[in-house]
Amino acid sequence: MLLSFSLIGSANAGNSNELRLHGNSTNKPAIDAIIKAFNATNPGIRITPTYYGVSDGQAAMMTQLLAGTAADILQAYPGSGAVNSVIALAENGYIAPLTYRPWSKFVAKNDQSLRYKGTIVGVPQTAQGVGYIYSKNILKKAGLTPPTKWSEVKTYCQAAKAKGTPAYGAPWATGWPTIMHSYATTATMVYAKDPDFTEKQYKKQTSFAGSAWVKSFEMLQDMNTWGCFQASPNSTTYAMIQEQLAAGKVLGWLGLPTVIPALKALNASEEWSFAAHPATENAAETFIPSANLVTFAINKKASSNVFARRFMDFLGSSTALEIQVRLSGGIPSIPLAGYVPTSPAISDIMAYRAKGKFFPFIDHQWKAPQIQQALIAGVQGMFAGTETPKSIAEKMDEALLKN
């Protein structure tokens, strides 16, 4: 059932019916379909989307916001740990609050990743989880099953390598995929054991360099030594790994199920599953990172535009949510009647969430994007031989305390 709309703002010269949207290329099919559905009942409003890759999109958004030329509707990121995260954008005065909207009552009161000074500043559509994305059929043919204990990762990688198919795709050239291993392992080794770890960091009571974060980087180094990855991770892009994964040339990748629609487009015959990435020898204590992901904000310059507000409310409607979860995958961030998981991977993530065996993406708690930037550059540097596990953690500490 479509949520009803209550518009705010006044008709003025700013009420242009020509709107622009800044979107993530991963979500293009869903956003295009959402715009089409919106236009079915709002034929007089034209929305022109422009799509970017994650890293390129972050840079373009910041350049355009600084120049005053950014789109009216911005696909952003929850929390404050990325340059395009809603809290960082709100703090810098780039986006407007979204108070008393039809969908806002469904945002959990304890979810601070969408709030700035207590006020909601983003429309959440889907949540995701980080884990090993793979095809059971492809693994069955290889005679392998995903590891559930850390010690099994080595034997899994060696067995996969012996068959000529790397176990894990590593698209480090794209940037953001470098964070996935650390997010997955520290969910278990750090945050499940000490949920207040980040708060203690800001109080200078602990640090990345003095914690299991260093071990997580050492584990990633070990995976490289064991032959877990394809050749030249720093020269491999996300698009290249998608093609290799769909063709069975790599067995899986540690990341988000948002890759699944692209994999289905490349290989419609496969079903894609999810396995938690182990960090210890006790599978029962494994946590996964899981939190809101696809989120939209409204440019402050467009905040008085009733048409922009109308579209923002549509993004929070059941119609738009159904389209997003069906075409992009993910778990509805707002309750959606009749929801059925779009893949086995999503069902697996929901099972972890139902058991409480998850921790939010940690960058949602970081107060500045420089921490994540130090992490990305650090992992790329480690694979280039210019950084060590300890030096990455130290540079992340420096970024946290400086910003």
Predicted regions and their residues:
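Conserved N-terminal structural module of periplasmic/extracytoplasmic solute-binding proteins
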Residues: 3-88, 100, 104, 268, ...
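Extracytoplasmic/periplasmic substrate-recognition and gating elements
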Residues: 40, 67, 142, 264-328, ...
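Extracytoplasmic/periplasmic solute-binding protein
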Residues: 121-124, 154-205
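Glycine-centered hinge/linker elements that transmit conformational signals in sensory
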Residues: 202-233
